[in-house]
């Protein structure tokens, strides 16, 4: 079960990143998986921090994982991806085909859109997600977690946390030359990976007392409850299994 704490439509993770999109349990498809992250704590963090800054990011990596399909795909692993050519068809005139370029995964997230406090990840769905609804040839479509791994320092203490944001790959995804083979992105599925993150965060860095929050209970798949910040007991389980305000 994963609970999600939401303030004004933003999802606060057990870390420094704040998720603008997608919302929990959203059915997704289309050309790309779009993820929007605020990496400034809504203006409280420097985009170019000093090495000895008491609160700062080290790295964010993202994977798409599923216990249903037992698959694990790289969205961004912190490295610069290889640029891959593909043939771009031009309407009906095959003689005017041009070579275009794509990448299998997204580059280092904190380096995207330099100078911007919001990072937009547009990950092209690989071939095995092509289909509509539950129909596909390779069995990849279904329920997934956007698994966000954060390495960061908060108040002079270093942490490594894993946060799972549940979505479903159930909307239509059409064939495209831009889609890469899934084997290029696939990693070993490790269901116990989040358990390796074994530190408890003492709170959420950017949600204080008196802030009106909405907690979506993952066990009930979307039931909501409201609360007032962290004025009562709060416990973040860093492994991403339980998140939210304990009222």
What is the predicted function of each stretch?
Residues 1-11, 227-247:
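Fungal secretory targeting signals
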